[in-house]
Amino acid sequence: MEKIAETINGLQHIGLPTNDLEKTVAFYEGLGFSVALRTVNEAAGEQVAFLQLKELMIEAYQTGRAAGRAGAVDHIALDVADVDTLFVLLRDGGYELLDDAVRFLPFWARGVRFF
């Protein structure tokens, strides 16, 4: 069986909820980040901005649920070689997963698959 660590390539992005996406984008642009992608998460009805500085990517998204949490890290995404294999390894290894299957969002050219 493949080792879990062998499937992880590095950090993919950090998810950051915000009540004011434009203010958040302006803040990070002031730090030298550039907008790599602006899109909408249709399923959640949220505006999304991916902000990049060198190898660091932040996914900022406007949500009505950020009250009292603005600026808090919501998720950290790891870049993996095979998301399906890692999902099975973690599920079968007894890890508590939030999703029953790998999910998809139509971000970027090929989309984003996650769990």
PLM regions and their residue ranges:
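Active-site loop/turn elements of alpha/beta-hydrolase fold enzymes
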Residues: 40, 80, 102
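Core segments of cupin and vicinal oxygen chelate
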Residues: 6-8, 16-57, 85, 92
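Conserved beta-strand in the GNAT
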Residues: 59-61
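Vicinal oxygen chelate
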Residues: 1-5, 10-20, 49-50, 67-115
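Short beta-turn/strand-loop junction motif enriched in small, turn-promoting residues
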Residues: 33, 63-65
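A short beta-turn/loop motif at secondary-structure boundaries
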Residues: 41-43, 66-68, 104-109
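Short, flexible, glycine/charge-rich loop motifs used to bind or transfer phosphoryl groups or to couple energy/partner
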Residues: 4-5, 65-67
